[in-house]
Amino acid sequence: MKIMKNFLQYVALLSAVALIAGLTACSSGSNPPSASSDNSVSTGITIESADATSDASLEEEPLKTAVTPNTSEATQGQSVGKNTTTKTKTSAYTLDTVQEKKFASLKGTTIHITTSGKQPSDGQKKVMTTMQNKYGVKFETQILGWEESQTKMGQMVAAGNPPDIGSFSEVLALRYIYANIAQPIDDYIVRDDEYAKQMRLEVYTINDKLYGVPAGYFQEYYLYYNKTLFKEYGLKDPYTEYYLKDNWNYNTFLALCKSATKYEADGKTLKFAGVGTWNYAVFMMANGGTGICPDGKGGFEVVIDKPAEMAGLQLLYDLVEANALYTGDSYTGFRQRKNAMLIERPAHAIGQFDYYNRMDDEIGMVPLPKGPNVSQYHVPITCDGYFVPRNANNPLGGAAFIYESAKQNLIEEHTTEPAALKKRRENISDEHLAIRDEYLKSAVPVYTHMEGLAGWWSGERDKMWNQIVVDKKKPAEVVDSIKGILKSALKRTIG
């Protein structure tokens, strides 16, 4: 079965999960029309309380816009549609840190944000309340759906009237950055701030400039396994028998996947496969591979044929050859015992489907195995992010909203506040959180911008992975055919 089914599941999944969504370079291509949305509606509101987060989305079409002068004075107070504003509240906070003092000058200003629904998400409301009380700001909200925002953000930037905050995913970030839709925010974010140091700012740092802040919590991929099923079939527990004994690598992982692949009495009909995932790139990333990487000259280069990447592709090929890779819907398959293990992020693997409660079987969690080309564990991550659009009227306000949103996510990872604690436990249990926290003390985060190349997500990506998963071609053959395609996509993206 082609992996597009997994992709569609992923898109539906992202749009339903409640997560807070959410580099100067040359621009190429024609400029988009200098027009804003005629159908968007803005409304100002005063927020009193909130307790959750917003959704995220994916978009693939290339977006280009010319660099235009900052029009903060010319467009002050302008927006799309009907506008009202919030009331400024008296601050009960003391601004003690360097970062907070940098935001102190925001008092009395208005921050323009967009919402995908008629009202801001609960997560946005919580951040808005904090900022109203802390910095004395006002908010202007504009209804702008995720898909609509991705097609119109470039237009609004070119017209000089974008919102102060935008969101992108790994599928969009690189193109937004090189199209000059996102602007550097180094002047607004203090990198050595206590919370900023935990925000993985390197993800959206390109050419030593910060263009965005990762959003959402629990961004890492883990291996979930059906502990009940493992016990029934006498399989070794990967956490206690491999990871804790420092014997968790690509060889032991492959052997476990093979032994966790079982057949019916006829010896031919598959009962369940060892592992399933939609994101085959994690096999490269757990070995430090990223497919493309900075070239040290302001651009990127294709490294899909380097040892770290090739070892990841080989592991995928070996799983396919052993019939140990489940290629159906691995989320449903995990619940229905069709794949004994699932590789995903906590909110997507567990929280989205309420599997801690819906599955009768006990669920185990273990970090991904250590790759053969690295000396320590590498943890694959993917995350959406917030950015400040070029020509935003209040870039400092946008950066403040981004910072406070990411800070709120970090706080909620270990909060004891009842509502947020309940939500966290729906995504990751206390037991699994303890495993995660200990693991992250030494694991190296790995992320890739390969997914953000023009034309990659919408078609070329599936062609690459299907050559291994469906056609069962060896990695060397696949790389020979795909390297040129990656180079072309890279050129279209960054020039």
Where are these regions (language model features)?
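Extracytoplasmic/periplasmic substrate-recognition and gating elements
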Residues: 355-419
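Glycine-centered hinge/linker elements that transmit conformational signals in sensory
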Residues: 254-257, 294-328
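Conserved C-terminal helix/tail region of periplasmic/extracytoplasmic solute-binding proteins
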Residues: 51-92, 390, 395, 409-495
